[in-house]
Regions:
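Gly/Ser-rich "nucleophile elbow"/oxyanion-hole loop immediately N-terminal to the catalytic nucleophile
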Residues: 68-75, 120-156, 169-170
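Cell-envelope and extracellular/periplasmic
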Residues: 82-86, 138, 154, 161, ...
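Catalytic active-site module of serine/aspartate enzymes centered on a nucleophile-bearing elbow/loop
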Residues: 254-267
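The feature captures the conserved acid-bearing segment of alpha/beta-hydrolase catalytic domains
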Residues: 183-254
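Bacterial N-terminal signal peptides
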Residues: 8-16
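Active-site machinery of serine-nucleophile hydrolases
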Residues: 78, 84-133
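A domain-start/cap signature at the N-terminus of enzymes
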Residues: 19-76, 168, 225-228, 238, ...
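Primarily recognizes the serine-hydrolase "nucleophile elbow" in alpha/beta-hydrolase
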Residues: 147-201
């Protein structure tokens, strides 16, 4: 075969590889890259979001950061990021913080929201958007329903992360592989566990508490109290780690936590 023939074969191979690239909700997925999607919100999620007088969101949006080498045919854990309600933060904004440590450890990092603002930024609103996003992902990648998920949040987002994780665990729709709770000063995870009773299996899920030694908002004492509360509830794998810093998210702590979740969950 001449040089021209080999060149044509190379072109055809490139085109075939390009056409087989993964997509999600009509958007291209690039390993190691970022994908933003929009999705329809089913009526039952609209009903949930509209509680407390909120508007009915018919369209949601999500940002996903993918690890290098991502292949939807292989199991890839998902790190679900939830932001605080303070300072008009959204989970899409906070997801960017977790991008580098999350993807470096081989995780997808996910943040979700609606395309409109709620009257009250309720947990039901957050749950509805997250649920609709996960449903959209599973529509294109059915196998993702079996992928482990972990919940991560900082400050007020850490409280919300625990609540959302328990609510989804109760539904039986996710395989919970960990909680990363940073800058937390109140144990909403135990409170939600008692309220929703998702089953004792959740008590085996690892919980990483990340505390800044000079944090004046969620003090080291507050973190110790949260750990003691989780221990009393019966959570068996609670780890409190302190770093030199204030009320902040420590990237190296995120990586260590994700490694620990994988080690214990064997995924």
């Amino acid at each position: 075969m001449g040089c021209k023939g080999w060149w044509l074969l190379g072109v055809f191979a490139f085109l075939a590889a390009s056409s087989d690239g993964a997509t999600l909700a009509g958007q291209s997925v690039v390993p190691g890259g970022k994908t933003e999607i929009r999705f329809a919100v089913p009526k039952y999620f609209q009903d949930l979001a509209a509680q407390a007088g909120n508007p009915r969101p018919d369209t949601g949006r999500a940002v996903l950061f993918f690890p290098s080498g991502f292949d939807p045919g292989r199991t890839t854990p998902i790190l679900i990021v939830t932001s605080t309600s303070d300072f008009n933060r959204t989970s899409l904004m906070d997801a960017e913080w977790y991008r580098a440590p999350g993807t470096a450890e081989g995780w997808i990092v996910l943040g979700t929201d609606a395309t409109i603002s709620p009257r009250i930024d309720s947990t039901q609103w957050r749950l509805a958007m997250l649920g609709a996003a996960l449903e959209t992902i599973r529509k294109d990648w059915p196998q993702s329903a079996r992928w482990p998920v972990a919940f991560a949040g900082f400050s007020g987002g850490s409280k919300r992360s625990g609540m959302l994780g328990v609510m989804l665990a109760k539904s039986g729709s996710v395989r919970v592989g960990g909680f990363f709770l940073s800058g937390i000063n109140e144990d909403r995870l135990s409170e939600s566990y008692r309220a929703y009773q998702p089953g004792r299996g959740l008590l085996e899920v690892p919980v990483w508490l990340s505390s800044g030694s000079r944090d004046t908002v969620a003090t080291p004492v507050a973190h110790n109290l949260v750990k003691a509360s989780l221990d009393r509830t019966g959570f068996k794998r609670v780890r409190l780690e302190q770093f030199d810093g204030g009320h902040q998210l420590k990237m190296s702590e995120v990586r260590r936590a994700l490694q620990w979740f994988r080690q214990l969950g064997r995924f």
